Amino acid sequence: MSVIRRLAAVLRQSDSGISAFLVTAPRKYKVYKIPKRTTGFRVIAQPAKGLKDIQRAFVQLYNFPVHDASMAYMKGKGIRDNAAAHAGNQYLLKADLEDFFNSITPAIFWRCIEMSSALTPQFEPQDKFFIEKILFWQPIKHRKTKLILSVGAPSSPVISNFCMYEFDNRIHAACNKLEITYTRYADDLTFSCNIPNVLKAVPSTIEALLKDLFGSELRLNHSKTVFSSKAHNRHVTGVTINNEETLSLGRDRKRFIKHLINQYKYGLLDNEDKAYLTGLLAFASHIEPGFITRMNEKYSLELMGRLRGQR
């Protein structure tokens, strides 16, 4: 059955209606920018509601393989699991893929379909046109530019994880031979081990594999390649691994949370800051529950419960 027919059945629309809608789908995005944590902006391209519905239906209809080393956008996994995988190792390497989502094109997607070593959906030639319209965004509406994966589409996390499957599979196998632990959280690659100097050769291995699989489309962001060890603070996707091999919020974040709780205690936070603090406390409870226990003891269960919206 064709992709259009399956989507039409699930969405209770006509084949012709969906086909006509998809012709201009890559231009049906609202674009805005949000500041990055350090410098610059991240471009978010959010699809129109009708296109979102089609994208969600597509990734529910077709099961794309995702490697076990992938920690982002997966039910039951998250940044805590990503950091915990490396907690018992002394030496750490962090690497970053440059402009990750926007570097994934239809050509990469189809190449990954062809070369996947896992069970992967197969499509009829006539489906190709519409699948590209469903999944990819055209950044400049009035000029014929190449299609790319957008940050903001509900299908993009699934497709990005799938497109990295073969990379994850091969780098994981290579790491296993060297007793290196490997995980990937979206564009963040993390490697760790207990053998000195083994990680030094990993960046060149990553680059060679990226070139082999994706040509020059996916690249390392060399400014974000960081080596660290137990002698220094080790941070993995925002989580600190301390020398006792347990996960921590880190000293600075704890100090900041305590400051905000104190501000709240004396009525000095506005509603926006309260909501932000509530989110920080939920994160803290997930990463380091003992810290929340200590805050309950210091500031009282009543105040902390009120802050978290429990009463």
UniProtKB/Swiss-Prot annotation:
PROSITE patterns: RT_POL. It catalyses: DNA(n) + a 2'-deoxyribonucleoside 5'-triphosphate = DNA(n+1) + diphosphate. GO terms for biological process: defense response to virus. Residues 15-241 form the Reverse transcriptase domain. It comes from the Bacteria. Mg(2+) binds at D96, D187, D188. Reverse transcriptase (RT) component of antiviral defense system retron Ec78, composed of a non-coding RNA (ncRNA), this reverse transcriptase (RT), a probable ATPase and a putative HNH endonuclease. Expression of retron Ec78 confers protection against bacteriophage T5. At multiplicity of infection (MOI) of 0.02 cultures slow growth when infected with T5 but do not collapse, at MOI 2 cultures enter growth stasis. Responsible for synthesis of msDNA-Ec78 (a linear ssDNA with a 5'-terminal phosphate residue). Unlike most known msDNAs the mature product does not have an RNA component. This is Retron Ec78 reverse transcriptase. The lineage of its organism: Bacteria, Pseudomonadati, Pseudomonadota, Gammaproteobacteria, Enterobacterales. The gene is ret.
